[in-house]
Amino acid sequence: MSKRFCVTGTCIPAKNYMVDISGRVDMIIHDYIDKGQYFTINRARQYGKTTTLYMLEQRLKSDYLVISLSFEAVDEYFASLGTLAEGLMMDIAECLKNQNASEIIIEEWNEPLSDKFPLRSLGMKITKLCKASNKKVVLMIDEVDKSSDNQIFLSFLGLLREKYLKCQQGKDITFQSVILAGVYDVKSLKLKIHPQEETKYNSPWNIAVDFSMDMSFNINDIKSMLEDYEREHNTGMDIGQISSIIYDYTSGYPYLVSRICQLTDERIASYEKDADEKKAWTKTGLLQAIKLLLKEPNTLFDDMTKKLLDYPALKDMLQKILFDGIDFPFKRENPIIDLGVTFGFLKDRNGIVAVANRIFETQLYDTFLSEMAVNDKLYIDAASNRNQYIASDMLQMDLVMKKFYEYFEEIYTENDHKFIEENGRKLFLLYLKPIINGTGNYYVEARTRDNRRTDIIVDYKGKRFIIELKIWHGNEYNLRGQKQLFDYLDYYKEDRGYLLSFNFNKNKQTGVNELEYDGKKILEVVV
């Protein structure tokens, strides 16, 4: 049976095309497990945590007794200390059987717990197990934060902490290493020790060391997966180029990398009209796959939408970054920034808060714009007249820009400067989106965005259009903007670009102008 790309559950090397993470697994074993460290792998949703634990288990089994658990769908365990102890005892017994532990060890483990002190009794069982085993014992728990707000779970963490500290003092024998995996960092749980007590940061998991390994995929990681695919399919793809494009859009977010590859393989190369495997694994094919990804419902984007509803301050920060070009200093001590990083939405770019990747940026732009579009006249006009912007099956960007000038003058010319300065870029994106929707892609260049400048890159059926949006205060600033755009065209090897200037000078001259410099042309629209 041939392999497939996998985006749900655990990736299995024999069944799935996947990044070779053996180097990371070896490093975790050497730097953490062999050294007896307790740690938490806390990363965003669908970031490869479960697959990493699976690969760790496979590598560890020859040298360690591995107890691998998951708190997914075990809510009933947390009804009381007794049910938690019984549930863990049952699950660990199953692990011992699967690891071919001796009958004596299994029989001792299955002896009844104390009714009065179930958790203390479980702790004594752990000591007996670790003494009796001829291998050191490693405990791994996935989806650990599914019950992390539960006081009973915290009592279990307290038990592990107590046993760890006693072991350090030579007074107990316990697990060699404990690995907890989830989205949230269990070390920073907010606890209420008593119902009336104020909320505190007081996690019993402060014995854990920091797990700082980068679990995102770099270009070479992506290459390793595509090389595996190419050995079976012989598409003739340029693996280096394809890996770079995927990385440019995903910044190595594991789910996004695998999903783009999966859509390219299973939709673009197999089921789309005029499907051709060789054509699919090109830049054009990848952009089609990215377009499908941004249109489809999936658990990652659903979770993003939910988090934006649950955390309005995070949503407000994202809007200020995307639409206003505001630079926020990156400090994870700020709880909003910390949440954004925890969810995988934000990252540190040279000390400034940035959206984690281009796919997330576009998804967030689309989400925010869709909220505005319902009653927006500019969006409705652009959507209803979309066909006029397409000729010979190609987007006519000159006409798009000229019509925006007409619509803007008609609809928004009487609005005050503050409204235009705060919303001008949103209005243009609202206008552009329905015109290219369904056929073209767009993204905003994060490297050049600030509170006065936004560069938009549109890909339409293989043709690229570069549009620079400027807030214009003074002629010198505008001339500098024109020079920047000419340089940008040179970087992208394009001969024509577009400049949209929102001019707030008293004696401004609005209109459409043609500019030329060093063989390159710019269509400038001033509103």
Label each PLM-derived region with a short phrase.
Residues 9-10, 148-249, 263, 267-297:
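The catalytic "switch" region of P-loop NTPases
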Residues 431-462:
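Active-site metal-binding core of divalent-cation-utilizing nuclease and nuclease-like domains
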Residues 40, 61-77, 139:
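Conserved catalytic segments around the Walker B and adjacent sensor/switch elements
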Residues 91-141, 145-161, 165-177:
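Mid-core helix/loop region of P-loop NTP-binding domains shared across ATPases and GTPases
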Residues 66-67, 79-103:
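Conserved NTP-binding/hydrolysis module of P-loop NTPases
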Residues 478-482, 489-518:
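Nucleic-acid nuclease catalytic cores
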Residues 218-343, 349-350, 377-387:
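Winged-helix-like regulatory helical subdomains adjacent to P-loop NTPase cores
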Residues 1-47, 51-59, 128-129, 410:
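Walker A/P-loop-proximal flanking segment of P-loop NTPase domains
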